[in-house]
Regions:
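Extracellular glycoside hydrolase catalytic/binding regions
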Residues: 174-178, 199-267, 290-307
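Substrate-binding cleft of secreted/luminal carbohydrate-active enzymes
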Residues: 28-38, 85, 246-248, 269-344
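Ser/Thr/Pro/Gly-rich low-complexity linker/stalk segments immediately outside membranes or between
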Residues: 31-54
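Glycoside hydrolase catalytic-domain groove-lining segments
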Residues: 106-111, 193, 246-287
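N-terminal Sec-pathway targeting helices
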Residues: 1-28
Length: 344
């Protein structure tokens, strides 16, 4: 997620330069750009619409006392008529050692879960937890440490005791191939299964060109993408996976939309049929080396996801809006019109 501003600026610039390097040197000129543009051609099928499996990331204000009952009522009205089923509410972050002082950082967690269950009984409230991680971030969480993984599991169980309907992890930036990340997913998933609730993750983007994650690390010392193989390994360990398909450094809306279409196709190929797959929508505005507001639009992401989905009848596919506190009425309208409204 974009909240990790301490590391994201430099890393985003370096990975953007890696993408430019790939566009210009290892492949024939503009081959990758042309490929992305071609992914954005054609018309989405009429069947590529919401299946009632969508989600939205919610900020920390919902659990720290800043929100009121009136805000919950307004949220229910905003979500009415959409395909949103899951709310990922920021209940962390976890401490670097995996612990969570829940009473201090999320004192209104129980109030929020109770309020949502009353106002929106068909929705699930998942606790969004995570932290920056080693080796990408100094002093981050060490997921290779078994003691840290134990504390992450204990913290997750404590959060569920506050009425949450699932755990949604966002550990960043996880390098492709990380065994510690897979291990913590295995451990926490075993716990959530005993509690009868889902384990969900926010996932890195997949390599838009084979081996690009290795190139990014070689050039900058930082990774951004996951190999398709590793994405599949993660997906097999969870109940739901949401691709953070934004902050791409792409300069044009057509290239960004093609990127989302490609990401959707790649993710569909390796996500088990029983696992929910969601594609992230950039419901925020910013201009920096990793994100062009004029290019990364909700409309382009929705159209790209629909093109990537094609005529698939997969029911457990959805879109996820990031993030409620930055989303404008125009963002919500683009989601509703592009994804929720019937063609014709």
């Amino acid at each position: 997620m974009r909240r990790w501003q301490g590391w994201s600026r430099r890393r985003s610039l370096l990975t953007a330069l890696a993408l430019v390097f790939v566009l210009a040197i290892p492949l024939p000129p503009f081959v990758l750009a042309v490929s992305l543009r071609l992914h954005y051609t054609g018309e989405p099928t009429a069947e590529a619409r919401t299946r009632g499996q969508d989600a939205v990331w919610l900020g920390h204000a919902w659990v720290d006392g800043r929100k009121t009952a009136a805000d919950v009522t307004a949220l229910a009205e905003q979500l009415h008529g959409t395909g949103i089923r899951d709310l990922y509410v920021h209940a962390g972050p976890l401490e670097a050692n995996g612990s969570l002082p829940l009473a201090m950082v999320a004192p209104k967690a129980r109030w929020f879960t109770d309020a949502v269950h009353k106002a929106m009984p068909t929705l699930r409230v998942q606790a969004w937890l995570g932290n920056v991680v080693l080796p990408e971030k100094e002093h981050g969480t060490d997921l290779d440490d078994p003691a840290v993984r134990d504390r992450v599991t204990t913290s997750s169980a404590a959060v569920l005791d506050q009425g949450f309907d699932g755990i949604h992890f966002d550990f960043e930036p996880v390098r492709s191939g990380s065994k510690g990340y897979l291990a913590v997913l295995d451990q926490v998933h075993a716990m959530t299964q005993t509690r009868g609730v889902p384990l969900s993750v926010a996932a890195a983007q997949l390599d838009p060109a084979s081996g690009l994650h290795d190139l990014a690390i070689a050039l900058s010392g930082h990774g951004k993408w996951w190999s398709q193989e590793y994405f599949g390994q993660v997906a097999r360990r969870v109940d739901q996976i949401a691709v953070m398909s934004y902050d791409t450094a792409l300069p044009l809306e057509s290239l960004y939309g093609g990127f989302v279409a490609q990401q959707t196709s790649l993710a569909l190929e390796v996500t088990p049929p029983e696992v929910d797959l969601l594609m992230g929508l950039p419901a925020y505005w910013e201009n920096n080396p990793s994100h062009r507001g004029s290019a990364e639009t909700v409309a382009a992401a929705v159209r790209g996801a629909r093109l990537g989905l094609g005529d698939s009848d997969r029911r457990n596919f959805g879109l996820a809006l990031y993030v409620d506190f930055a989303a404008t009425p125009a963002h919500w309208a683009a989601y509703r019109q592009g994804w929720c409204a019937a063609d014709g």
